[in-house]
Amino acid sequence: MGRPPCCDKIGVKKGPWTPEEDIILVSYIQEHGPGNWRAIPSNTGLLRCSKSCRLRWTNYLRPGIKRGDFTEHEEKMIIHLQALLGNRWAAIASYLPHRTDNDIKNYWNTHLKKKLEKLQSPENGKCQDGNSSVDSDKSVSKGQWERRLQTDIHMAKQALCDALSLDKTSSSTDDPKLSTVQTTQPRPFQASTYSSAENIARLLENWKKKSPVNASSTSQAGSSESTTTSFNYPSVCLSTSSPSEGAISTNFISFNSSNSDILEDHDQAKFEAATNGVNFQDESKPILDNQMPLSLLEKWLLDDSAAVAQGQDVDF
C-alpha cells in the first residue's frame, strides 16, 4: 500500500507545538539553516517528524510572515490563482511570499468563497432595502469583472470586444444624419429598370421600321427561288425524244410560265403592301394556299405522262 506516514511511527508526538519546541527548532535552523529536515528530529531531540518540523517553520516560525487581514490586491491574486491552479495552496503561496499556504487556504474557505458565491447570484448581491450606495454598486461591478477575469484571459478579451462592438452600434444608431442620408439615397435598381425600359421601347421602334424592308427582301428571295425551281422541271422534260412526251413538256412549260406570271403578280402586290406598311405575316398564308394546288397539278401531270409512256410500250 506504499510507505506509511512518518507521524504514525511509535514515539512520535502529534498535536500542537509547545513554546519550548518552537525555541529548539528556531535555534537549530538559525545555526544550520533550513534544508535537511530529516536530520532535525534526531539532532535536536524533538519527538516530531520531519514533515511536522518543516510545516511549523514555513507556516509559523520563519521570518517575514505577514499576519492580519488580506488586502484587496492579495484577494484578487488569490481569486485569479485559485481559478487557474485550483486548490494547490503551496503553489499559490509561492506568488504571495509574505503569506503562508495555510493562511491562504483558511482565508479562502472562510471569506473569499462565500464572497464569490454572493457575487455570482445577482439576487443575493442586491440590497434588500433598495437604498444601496454608490460604493456598493462599484464593488459589485468589480466583482463581476474579476469573476470573468479569473476564469480565462480569452473570455476577458471576448467581453472587451463585445463591449466595443456595442459602443459602435449605439454610436451608429444615435447619429440622425446618417439615417437621413441612407433613407434619401435613391436605389440604383430603379434607374436601371427605367433605362432598360427606354432601351426596349427604342429597339421595338427600330424593329417595326426595319421589318417591312426585311419582309420585302425575303419575299424577293422566295420568288427567285420559286422561279428557279419551276424552270428546272422543263429542262428535264425537254430532254425526252417521244412526241407524246414533247407535248406533255410543252404543256408543262406553258403551265410553269403561267405559274411564274402568277408569282410575279403576287410579288408585285406584296411589294406594294410592304411599302404601305402592311404586315408580312398576314400575306404569307395565301402563298401557302396557292402553292398547295400547284403541287397537286404537278403530280397529276407526271402521273399522266407515265401512263402515256406505258401505253406506247404496250403498243410496241
Swiss-Prot record:
Keywords: DNA-binding, Nucleus, Repeat, Transcription, Transcription regulation
Region (Disordered): 119-144, 168-193, 209-230
Keyword flag Ribosomal protein: no
BP GO terms, sorted: response to auxin
Regions of compositional bias (Low complexity) in chain numbering: 216-230
GO CC entries: nucleus
Annotated localization: Nucleus
Comp. bias intervals (Polar residues): 181-193
Tissues in which the protein is found: Expressed in flowers, leaves and weakly in seed pods.
DNA-binding region per Swiss-Prot/TrEMBL record: 37-61, 89-112
InterPro entries: Homeodomain-like_sf, Myb_dom, Myb_TF_plants, SANT/Myb
UniProt-recorded Gene Ontology molecular function terms: DNA binding
Alphabetical list of Pfam families matching this protein: Myb_DNA-binding (PF00249)
HTH myb-type domain ranges (all copies): 9-65, 66-116
Keyword Transcription appears in the UniProt entry: yes
Basic and acidic residues composition-biased segments: 135-144
Function per UniProt: Transcription factor.
PANTHER family: MYB FAMILY TRANSCRIPTION FACTOR, MYB-RELATED PROTEIN 306-LIKE
Name of the protein in question: Myb-related protein 306
Organism whose genome encodes this protein: Antirrhinum majus (Garden snapdragon)
High-level lineage: Eukaryota, Viridiplantae, Streptophyta, Embryophyta, Tracheophyta
